[in-house]
């Protein structure tokens, strides 16, 4: 096994798989606004090739950044010179990637049913799409697969529809993996899909949800980016579209929505991880959802699932003005977080995007809320930075289990509070 792993790593190196040997993830603690601004100066130095996992927002909020090996000494010297404290969260990113790849290689057997599918490992795009087909074949009266569009690179964008019948019923939308490197979200989405088929008719609360509403689940919301994380660059976040006049690829699909687009909280630089794109809905992955939601016209809850930081967020992100339904959203978020914590003790914070983390313009749930979808939420799943986007596969099922309890709380509330 060890020889095979070494051989596979060598082959990937030859084929252009990006290497992260010696890269470190630093947690920076800015004591005041002046130090936050100094960290932002670092962010603007493109030659350092820094990858901010948690942005420099305001004092008191941790800033996590992946630093390439050639830039480590410069970054640490800069921070120390300005009296900015930091700690090393991940000593060598590549070591964690090697562990992740070895774990995946050990569980590559092709599943013949969704019962034998391994929910405790990470899967490729093809494997997830095969899982979707298996689920539809096993539960044709409950599950169907619809294609809402094609990606920039021509891949189909699939959504699972769970329904007990009827036309244009009120519906709940859940998406995972809009940021491609957040692998625990796509893995959780797969688990949710199976959970829906298992719990319908068994769990009275969930059965009541599906008896009254359809559920749409988009497990891989950014297929091009997700495929790229498996084949080339595990740390890829954005779409894979091309921007005229720039060699940099991709747009942040969570800054591309028509809600506060172009305001502070997104970047106009195509090389930035938070590049918003040239205009709202420029990304077909975003436009496909916009068109679907608009044409459906009866979506009552919209939940977009990210990682990491252990947060449950509601609008707004682009403005500090409270959402008209803030009191209800805040109380519902509190109830959902309480349910989540009850299973494994995982602590979540909750609140509006702008008050809880930072200003973010052009975000998914700000747009859905502007379309009249009252129950618009974003999750940030495990963890709080110890492993970040490289969450061990052993945490997939516990993460999905606890998140399901929060989702069920939101779905149950949505059914019981029609509008």
Swiss-Prot record:
Cofactor entry: Zn(2+)
Describe cofactor binding as the record notes it: Binds 1 zinc ion per subunit.
Which residues hold substrate? 179-182, 237, 254-255, 307-308, 358
Where along the chain is the active site annotated? 380
| GO biological process annotation, one example | proteolysis
- List the subcellular locations: Secreted
Report whether Secreted shows up as a keyword of the record.
yes
Q: Which key words tag this protein in UniProt? A: Carboxypeptidase, Disulfide bond, Hydrolase, Metal-binding, Metalloprotease, Protease, Secreted, Signal, Zinc, Zymogen
Fetch the InterPro entries from UniProt: CPA_M14_CPD (IPR034248), M14A-like_propep (IPR036990), M14A_act_pep (IPR003146), Peptidase_M14 (IPR000834)
List the catalytic activities from the record.
Release of a C-terminal amino acid, but little or no action with -Asp, -Glu, -Arg, -Lys or -Pro; leukotriene C4 + H2O = leukotriene F4 + glycine
Q: What class of enzyme is it?
A: hydrolase
Q: Where does the protein principally reside?
A: secreted
Q: Which family does it belong to?
A: Belongs to the peptidase M14 family.
**Physiological role:** Carboxypeptidase that catalyzes the release of a C-terminal amino acid, but has little or no action with -Asp, -Glu, -Arg, -Lys or -Pro. Catalyzes the conversion of leukotriene C4 to leukotriene F4 via the hydrolysis of an amide bond.
Question: What subunit structure does UniProt give?
Answer: Monomer. May form a complex with proelastase 2.
What is the protein's given name? Answer: Carboxypeptidase A1
Q: What organism is listed for this UniProt entry?
A: Rattus norvegicus
Q: What is the lineage of its organism?
A: Eukaryota, Metazoa, Chordata, Craniata, Vertebrata
């Amino acid at each position: 096994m060890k020889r095979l792993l070494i051989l596979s790593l060598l082959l990937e190196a030859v084929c252009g798989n990006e290497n992260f040997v010696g890269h470190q993830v630093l947690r920076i603690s800015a004591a005041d606004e002046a130090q936050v601004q100094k960290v932002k100066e670092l962010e603007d130095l493109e030659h350092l090739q820094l990858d901010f996992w948690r942005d420099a927002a305001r004092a008191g909020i941790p800033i996590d950044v992946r630093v390439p090996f050639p830039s480590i000494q410069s970054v640490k010297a800069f921070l120390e010179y300005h009296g900015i404290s930091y700690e090393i969260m991940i000593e060598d990113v590549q070591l964690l990637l090697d562990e992740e790849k070895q774990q995946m290689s050990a569980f590559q057997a092709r599943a013949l049913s969704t019962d034998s599918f391994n929910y405790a490992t990470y899967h490729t795009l093809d494997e997830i799409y095969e899982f979707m087909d298996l689920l539809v074949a096993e539960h044709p009266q409950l599950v169907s697969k619809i294609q809402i569009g094609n990606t920039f690179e021509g891949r189909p964008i699939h959504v699972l529809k769970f329904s007990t019948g009827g036309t244009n019923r009120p519906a709940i939308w859940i998406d995972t993996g809009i940021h491609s490197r957040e692998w625990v979200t796509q893995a959780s989405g797969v688990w949710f899909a199976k959970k829906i088929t298992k719990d319908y008719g068994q769990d009275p609360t969930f059965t009541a949800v599906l008896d009254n509403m359809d559920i749409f689940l988009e497990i891989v919301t950014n297929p091009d980016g997700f495929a790229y994380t498996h084949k080339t660059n595990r740390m890829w976040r954005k779409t894979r579209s091309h921007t005229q006049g720039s060699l940099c690829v991709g747009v942040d699909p969570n800054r591309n929505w028509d809600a506060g687009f172009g305001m502070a909280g997104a970047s106009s630089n195509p090389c930035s991880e938070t590049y918003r794109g040239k205009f709202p809905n420029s990304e077909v992955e975003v436009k496909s959802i916009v068109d679907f939601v608009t044409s459906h016209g009866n979506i009552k809850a919209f939940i977009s699932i990210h990682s990491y930081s252990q947060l449950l967020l509601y609008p707004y992100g682009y403005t500090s003005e409270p959402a008209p339904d803030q009191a209800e959203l805040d109380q519902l978020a509190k109830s959902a977080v309480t349910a989540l914590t009850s299973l494994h003790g995982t602590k979540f914070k909750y609140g509006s995007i702008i008050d809880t983390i930072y200003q973010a313009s052009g975000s998914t749930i700000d747009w859905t809320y502007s379309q009249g979808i009252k129950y618009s939420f974003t999750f940030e799943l495990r963890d709080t930075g110890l492993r970040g986007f490289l969450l061990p596969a052993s945490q997939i099922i516990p993460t999905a289990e606890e998140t399901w309890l929060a989702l069920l709380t939101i779905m149950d509330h949505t059914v019981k509070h029609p509008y």
